[in-house]
Structure formats: C-alpha cells, structure tokens
Amino acid sequence: MKKPVVIGLAIAAIVAVIAGGTWWYQSRQDDGLTLYGNVDIRTVNISFRVGGRLASLNVDEGDAIKAGQVLGELDHAPYENALMQAKAGVSVAQAQYDLMLAGYRDEEIAQAAAAVRQAQAAYDYAQNFYNRQQGLWKSRTISANDLENARSSRDQAQATLKSAQDKLSQYRTGNREQDIAQAKASLEQAKAQLAQAQLDLQDTTLIAPANGTLLTRAVEPGSMLNAGSTVLTLSLTRPVWVRAYVDERNLSQTQPGRDILLYTDGRPDKPYHGKIGFVSPTAEFTPKTVETPDLRTDLVYRLRIIVTDADDALRQGMPVTVKFNDEVRHE
C-alpha cells in the first residue's frame, strides 16, 4: 500500500474516533434532566425607621454597596433635642428616687416638729377660747353664732395639728415603700425614654444591610420622609440563586445538595456550577415566566439552586438552562 493512502486512512480513523466521541458525549449530556429557570431577582427596599428631612445621600444608582456602609442621613437636630430632653428627664427622676431612698434630713424633721408645736399652741388657744365662749353662751352673754364661730376655729386648729403631726411622723419613719416604688418606676420610665431617643438619633443614619448594587434612588436630599418610606433599592448580588421548576415525575432527581450545571446564552460552552439548596414541599401551578412549554399546564415544585462559582456576568433575571446529567457529580 502506498504511503499517501496509509496516511489518509489514519486521518480518516482519527476523525471517526473524534466524531464518535463527540456524539457519545453529547448523547450522554442529553440523557439527563434539563430544566429552564432564571437567576433570582433579590432586592431590598431601604428606608429610615424614623421620619424627617433628608439631609444627604452618598450613593448613586449602579454603585457597588458594602454592608455597613453609610448611605445617607436625615436632619439630626430634632432628634438631638429630644435626646437632651430625655437625659434631663433621667436626671430629675434619679434625683427624686435618691431623695426617696435617703429619707428626710434632720433639719426637715426639726422644722416639722416646730410646726407641730406651733399647731399645738394654736389648737390649745382655740380650745380654751371655745370653752370660755361656752360659759358666756350659757349665761346668755354671747349669741349662738359667736359660739359656733369659736367651735369652727377650734375644729380648724385641730385639723391643722393633725396634719402637722402626720407630717412629722412621716419624716421620722421615712418614705413609704409605695412612694419609693413609684419613684423607681418613674426613673425606669425615664431611662426607657432616653434609650428610645438614642435609638431614634442613631436611626437618622441610613446603613446598608448587605452587599449589593444600588438599583434605584427614589428620593433626593431635602425631601420630607415618613418612617418606612423607601429611599433606596438594593439588588443583592451574593449569594446568587437560580429559580427553576420541576414536575412530579422528575422530583426524585432533585435532592438537596445535588451538583448542577448551569448554562447561559452568553456562555453556552462554559457552564456555571451549583448545588440544589431548597426544594419546595408544596406544588404550585407553573408561573408564566417558565419557558418550557410542556410545563405550563402542570403542577410543579420550585427549586432554589445556589451558584457556587458566580461572577458578575450572571445577572439577576437572566435565563438559565439547568442540567442534571449524571456526569455532573464527577466534575
């Protein structure tokens, strides 16, 4: 056999082997389950927990955001004033509670005792005057009205004496437990108001809750905002999830933890890798976004696939082809 013929046969054999191997690989690739899904759209609406005038925003749409980053601030002044008032309230309540615990000073007790002596003298005088008036009334020297006035003065002096005696007794025995408990409760209430004022002031600073990309900027500085009004919308970029749906007959192939290959139109020959992270326990009618025609009238189960080697080319909402072929487990 001539040498050119031998070379030609060898080349033909090599081509045949390559073609056969390609056919075998593709047939093996097509043997497994194929689903169609989308990269999950995950967003967070960011807002202030308190209301007020928006003083500043530090980010624009498209900016990369880091968790803990300061995004903007409200006008602090009203909340700083409220904090000062709350601190003063705690000081007043603390002083009152300390007074209740300490009881009364010796000077106050001495003043109360002097008031009792003064009230006692006034009462004694009023009682003696009333006694004299009684004698005069019996001898018809004064009128009944004069006697009644003397009795009224005596009764008033007696009430004043009783009040002074009670006050002296309180000063000597100290404050009642109920009064001390009430003062303590007032102090705790003032401390709670202070803590809330501190939290409100802290909440005038808008902090990023997670890493992501700023999707929308809904308001501008100078706007008056209510608590909870959306200021920014953040698109969460990590972790990347793919949402897909599987019918009941293929449900057994979708155990959590199974390795998956994910293909996009932009990378048809270079798949992403992922793992099944969640399989819905309940069936639902196929969402309109599912691209597979033969699933649209079925009851299906939702899958969440966690992409383990995601990059910035894998965008939210992007359609993805999900491959469950057996070779995935060994890649």
UniProtKB/Swiss-Prot annotation:
Annotated InterPro entries: CusB_D23, UPF0194_membrane_YbhG, UPF0194_transport
Gene3D superfamilies: 2.40.30.170, 2.40.50.100, Helix hairpin bin (1.10.287.470)
Primary location recorded for the protein, binned into one broad class: periplasm
Keywords noted in UniProt: Coiled coil, Periplasm, Signal
Signal peptide feature range: 1-19
Oxidoreductase keyword on record: no
Pfam families, sorted: HlyD_D23
Compartments reported by the entry: Periplasm
KW Amino-acid biosynthesis (keyword) present: no
One CC-aspect GO term: periplasmic space
Coiled coil regions in record: 107-208
Disulphide connectivity of cysteines: none
Domain of life: Bacteria
PANTHER family per UniProt: EFFLUX SYSTEM COMPONENT YKNX-RELATED, UPF0194 MEMBRANE PROTEIN YBHG
Family matches, as NCBIfam families: PRK03598.1
Family statement drawn from the similarity comment of this UniProt entry: Belongs to the UPF0194 family.
Protein name stated in the entry: UPF0194 membrane protein YbhG
Protein's organism: Salmonella paratyphi A (strain AKU_12601)
